[in-house]
UniProtKB/Swiss-Prot annotation:
It comes from Xenopus laevis (African clawed frog). Residues 43-48 are annotated as: C5-methylcytosine binding. Pfam families: CSD. Its main location: cytoplasm. In the CSD domain, Trp-43 specifically recognizes C5-methylcytosine (m5C) modification through its indole ring. The gene is ybx1. The record marks W43 as: Important for C5-methylcytosine-recognition. This is Y-box-binding protein 1.
Length: 303
């Protein structure tokens, strides 16, 4: 019995000695315990960058850090291993126990990585907008000199010269043409409003052009619609109507200025006129009485 126990103890010691003698290399300052060990990822935290791998042979949990991953998924931005993924790694001796190093996929392929790890955006490697080339100014000057020489030799028309201009000049008009784009609705609405204004003026004053111009101006700038120009129209129409009425009444009635003068003179002369008027009235009454008395006397004498 004692011999059997001794042989069983010697076998594990021999296995450990072989395992220790096989990996002669070291990873940094850490001693390598085993190489090319297969295991299953128990869990891995992408944010903290560490996790544990369960060895398939000994069912032991081995600590793994993201820096130990040798071949990462090229599509992933961060180094990581996925939960439940089968990986191949080396076991080294760490400060607090066994650690994994040189982590790869089976047979040295890149690991799949965690599904929570961010993907790498390839289009960010190349900028969308690039500056002009270094020899851009020299080429531009050469092009200008060549264009001038061609113009002097062949003397092309204006359309040809515009077509031969460099492309960088064509970029500027769109920036300047944005301003009139914002004003186009006003220009497009202006004639419509002008027609409406002309239709409204045709009922009252079609012959004169001032009201129509004012309406066109209002259509171009609508903020002046509620301003004083609207109040001026009835005044002008009223003045025109007064002028027409005055033209009709000039034949029958004197102008208003003369009326005021007559009334004013009448008020001034009013205190002096009563005496004279009374005297005239008395004289007229006496003469009328005499005239009436004389025919009566003549009639009486005739009888």
């Amino acid at each position: 019995m004692s011999s059997e126990v001794e042989t069983q103890q010697q076998q594990p010691d021999a296995l450990e000695g072989k395992a220790g003698q096989e990996p002669a290399a070291t990873v940094g300052d850490k001693k390598v315990i085993a190489t090319k060990v297969l295991g299953t990822v128990k869990w891995f935290n992408v944010r903290n960058g560490y996790g544990f791998i369960n060895r398939n042979d000994t069912k032991e949990d081995v600590f793994v850090h993201q820096t130990a991953i040798k071949k990462n998924n090229p599509r992933k931005y961060l180094r990581s291993v996925g939960d439940g993924e089968t990986v191949e790694f080396d076991v080294v001796e760490g400060e607090k126990g066994a650690e994994a190093a040189n982590v790869t996929g089976p047979e040295g392929v890149p690991v799949q990585g965690s599904k929570y790890a961010a993907d790498r955006n390839h289009y960010r490697r190349y900028p969308r907008r690039r500056g002009p080339p270094r020899n851009y100014q020299q080429n531009y000057q050469n092009n200008e000199s060549g264009e001038k020489a061609e113009e002097n030799e062949s003397a092309p028309e204006g359309d040809d010269s515009n077509q031969q201009r460099p492309y960088h000049r064509r970029r500027f008009p769109p920036y300047y043409s944005r301003r009139p784009y914002g004003r186009r609705p006003q220009y497009s609405n202006a004639p419509v409003q002008g027609e409406e204004a002309e239709g409204a003026d045709s009922q009252g004053t079609d012959e004169q052009g001032r009201p129509a111009r004012q309406n066109m101006y209002r259509g171009f700038r609508p903020r002046f619609r509620r301003g004083p120009p609207r109040q001026r129209q009835p005044r002008e129409e009223g003045n025109e109507e007064d002028k027409e009425n005055q033209g009709d009444e000039t034949q029958s009635q004197p102008p208003p200025q003369r009326r005021y003068r007559r009334n004013f003179n009448y008020r001034r002369r009013r205190p002096e006129n009563p005496k004279s008027q009374d005297g005239k009235e008395t004289k007229a009454a006496e003469t009328s009485a005499e005239n009436t008395s004389t025919p009566e006397a003549e009639q009486g004498g005739a009888e």
